[in-house]
């Protein structure tokens, strides 16, 4: 292992220890203080069915804390229920271009526009993401890239294709009223076209957290690695191995029922990508994404964000994202 790799792994371990062991990603709209009822064990199938179809927001009193020490023995045969609001009163929700940390049950359709993509015109994307909890410990997140349209790195005509499908198993490491920690492993499949800079096979393990101790302030983030593999990914597309990190503080200004501006949160997400392989310069890229999210009513949410690179080289000038979400 190189010195650079050792430093990165040491940093990851330090972050996990500081945020996890030293502490005492909807759970969308549950309120009330957390309780600690006796766990009711179900069959694996029953727990999955109730997690996916049950009224998981009606009885927040059935929620209880999960500890890191029982990650292999507790919660796997219990239906997922929405966790209560954090200690400061903020709901557990997701936002655009930031790590989740918490479990959710929802679907979101997202449109993205990228200006000056690879210095060769614009890029337009459309995707559908689903968050599907199977029990209190395990969830599947899927990202279906319905369309990716750009001129590639050197093309003169726009080409539209299906993108790279991503499926992400997620495990809750621990959860209290104030903090949720999760381990996620995203599997990117090369279903897209290399012309669009897709067709990449990669594994991306991440550690993520969500926290709320004081009023409407929520801090989320995490660290991970982007690990591409295969001849097409590395040689044809030029995918690079990278260390990634994210932190996204935000503040909630309105109550849930103040529609169409309910649960109004403004946030700024900072994303860092540091290339760590030997296939080129080991550059570090940083971008800032200010964003907003609001509850329109009937568990429909509107999300928007603008990502702006702040380091060079810049892969694009700016990227606009808009999402329409339904919590179910």
Spans of model-derived segments:
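Transmembrane beta-barrel domains of Gram-negative outer membranes and organellar outer membranes
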Residues: 28-328
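Bacterial N-terminal signal peptides that target proteins for export
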Residues: 2-10
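Sec/Tat signal peptide C-region and signal peptidase I cleavage site
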Residues: 23-27
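Charged interaction patches that mediate protein-protein contacts
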Residues: 1-2, 22, 266
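Bacterial N-terminal signal peptides
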Residues: 11-20
């Amino acid at each position: 292992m190189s010195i650079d790799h050792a430093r990165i792994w040491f940093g990851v371990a330090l972050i996990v220890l500081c945020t996890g062991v030293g502490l005492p990603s909807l759970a969308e709209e549950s309120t009330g203080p957390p309780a600690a009822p006796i766990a009711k064990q179900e069959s694996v199938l029953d727990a999955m069915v109730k997690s996916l179809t049950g009224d998981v927001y009606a009885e927040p009193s059935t929620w209880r804390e999960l500890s890191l020490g029982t990650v292999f023995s507790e919660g796997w045969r219990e239906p997922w229920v929405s966790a209560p609001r954090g200690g400061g009163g903020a709901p557990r929700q997701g936002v655009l271009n930031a790590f989740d940390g918490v479990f959710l049950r929802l679907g979101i359709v997202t449109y993205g526009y990228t200006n000056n993509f690879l210095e060769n015109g614009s890029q337009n994307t459309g995707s559908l993401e689903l968050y599907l909890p199977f029990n209190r410990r395990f969830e599947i997140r899927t990202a279906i890239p319905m369309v990716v349209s750009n001129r590639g790195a050197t093309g003169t005509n726009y080409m539209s294709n299906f993108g790279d499908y991503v499926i992400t198993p997620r495990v809750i490491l621990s959860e209290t009223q104030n903090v949720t920690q999760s381990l996620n492993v995203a599997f990117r499949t090369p279903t897209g076209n290399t012309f669009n800079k897709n067709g990449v096979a990669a594994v991306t393990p991440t550690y993520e957290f969500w926290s709320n101790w004081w009023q409407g302030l929520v801090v989320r983030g995490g660290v991970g690695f982007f690990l591409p593999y295969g001849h097409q990914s590395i040689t044809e597309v030029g995918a690079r191995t990278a260390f990634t990190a994210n932190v996204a503080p935000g503040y909630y200004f309105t109550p849930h029922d103040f529609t169409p501006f309910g649960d109004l949160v403004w946030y700024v997400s900072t994303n860092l990508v540091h290339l760590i392989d030997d296939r080129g310069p080991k550059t570090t890229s940083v971008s800032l994404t200010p964003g907003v999210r609001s509850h329109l009513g009937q568990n429909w949410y509107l999300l928007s964000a603008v990502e702006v690179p702040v380091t060079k080289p810049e892969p694009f000038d700016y990227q606009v994202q808009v999402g329409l979400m339904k919590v179910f």
